[in-house]
């Protein structure tokens, strides 16, 4: 009982202001993708190109998110998490304003790539600082609660983006993103602690390569990092492709498109709330196992229904909603186990995880796009199911050792 009260106090006093400031920046970068995706139909019209460029915007954004992961984590280990994170918030604001100067889809896509680099700061720097600051059960609760706030972006983003382009030019969205990032900068400047453990060490590229080689040789880490990527791929593929699937493919309105996102991301939030409630009461491996059933089952429902009837978009939404609940329940624990499967400094480990995940997302979204172009909704959801089955196989291998995630920390 005393331990639980102590955890509650720590969660309330130590883990409030900094995570809220970080999640505001995270929200700005996420809504920078989720809100603009429905607006991409207006963007391609502005530049006079076809709709195949719609998911490419998200591909470029996520590719940027992979670009500097390898460097930012180790740099923050040595010069400090705080200055690197503050630089990231300012960088995102500048690139959001710079995109207003583009005059072709190629320039727009390049700026989306540069904006995407801002994602590198979240996992490799911000989340690493949080993981270093708190014990396991408290950290998982913080991560789950932060995820709920961050998930407002994909929940409200499609609705807000669809409404925005009916009322205002799409360019105004990027001014909003820049303003949110600047507000996050002010909060982080005041509240972010310093948790780096290797400050003052010289950054050597050969030593950096050696560090990454040690991390990647760890089979448990590699399996967990791949699993984290495949877990979220169906959700990100849906975010990227759903404007085309719903509005162009099914002929529905932008309002209908936005409303179909609500059950999916609402269930994702519910999964995170369930995780926050169960964390500390159940071993981490048990939480992952509980999430596996709805994850794979939901993807199977979406695939079978759309292979049987190509326009069964309501069944597809129901299946993806069930999957989203599962990922909300399982993913934070899997992330934690993977991060601490290596003894290397957490900036380096987190950066390696981020690069692997972003590579899977970048490649997977393009594969998902072509699956839909070639085979419609059925092929798209079959691709998502394959991703879920790969996740299941990797997690089964990772949890084969009964000692992994088998303790309950309060």
From Swiss-Prot:
Top-level taxonomic group: Bacteria
Record GO terms (molecular function): sodium:proton antiporter activity
Pfam families: MFS_1 (PF07690)
Segments in the Cytoplasmic topological domain: 1-15, 74-84, 131-144, 188-226, 277-286, 335-346, 400-410
PROSITE patterns the UniProt entry points to: MFS (PS50850)
CDD domains registered for this protein in UniProt: MFS_MdfA_MDR_like
Transmembrane residue ranges: 16-36, 53-73, 85-105, 110-130, 145-165, 167-187, 227-247, 256-276, 287-307, 314-334, 347-367, 379-399
Complexes and interactors: Monomer.
Name this polypeptide is given: Multidrug transporter MdfA
The species this protein was found in: Edwardsiella piscicida
Gene name tied to this protein: mdfA
């Amino acid at each position: 009982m005393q331990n639980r009260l102590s955890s509650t106090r720590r969660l309330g006093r130590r883990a409030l202001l900094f995570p809220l400031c970080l999640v505001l920046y995270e929200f700005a970068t996420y809504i920078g993708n989720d809100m603009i995706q429905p607006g991409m139909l207006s963007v391609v019209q502005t530049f006079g190109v076809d709709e195949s460029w719609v998911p490419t915007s998200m591909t470029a954004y996520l590719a940027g998110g992979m670009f500097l992961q390898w460097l930012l984590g180790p740099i923050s280990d040595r010069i400090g998490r705080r200055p690197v994170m503050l630089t990231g918030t300012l960088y995102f604001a500048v690139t959001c304003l710079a995109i207003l100067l583009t005059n072709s889809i190629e320039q727009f896509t390049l700026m989306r790539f540069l904006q995407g680099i801002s994602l590198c700061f979240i996992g490799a720097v911000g989340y690493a600082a949080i993981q270093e600051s708190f014990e396991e059960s408290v950290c998982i609760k913080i991560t789950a609660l932060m995820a709920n706030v961050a998930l407002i972006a994909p929940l409200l983003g499609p609705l807000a983006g669809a409404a925005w382009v009916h009322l205002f030019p799409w360019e105004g969205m990027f001014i909003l993103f820049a303003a949110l990032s600047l507000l996050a900068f002010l909060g982080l400047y005041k509240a972010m602690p310093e948790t780096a453990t290797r400050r003052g060490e010289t950054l050597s590229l050969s030593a950096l390569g050696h560090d990454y080689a040690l991390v990647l040789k760890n089979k448990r880490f590699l399996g967990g990092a791949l699993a984290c990527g495949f877990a979220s791929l169906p959700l990100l593929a849906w975010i990227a492709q759903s404007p085309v699937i719903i509005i162009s493919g099914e002929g529905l309105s932008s309002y209908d498109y936005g409303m179909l996102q609500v059950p999916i991301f609402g269930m994702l939030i519910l999964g995170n709330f369930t995780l926050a409630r169960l964390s500390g009461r159940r071993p981490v491996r048990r939480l992952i196992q509980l999430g596996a059933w709805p994850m794979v089952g939901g993807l199977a429902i979406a695939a079978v229904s759309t292979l049987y009837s190509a326009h069964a978009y309501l069944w597809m939404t129901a299946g993806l909603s069930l999957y989203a609940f599962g990922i909300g329940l399982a993913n934070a624990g899997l992330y934690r186990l993977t991060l601490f499967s290596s003894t290397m400094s957490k900036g380096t480990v987190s950066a390696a995880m981020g690069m692997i995940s972003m590579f899977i997302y970048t490649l997977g979204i393009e594969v998902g796009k072509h699956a839909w172009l070639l085979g419609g909704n059925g092929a798209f959801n079959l691709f998502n199911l394959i991703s879920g089955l790969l996740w299941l196989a990797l997690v089964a291998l990772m949890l084969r050792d009964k000692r992994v995630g088998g303790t309950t920390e309060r």
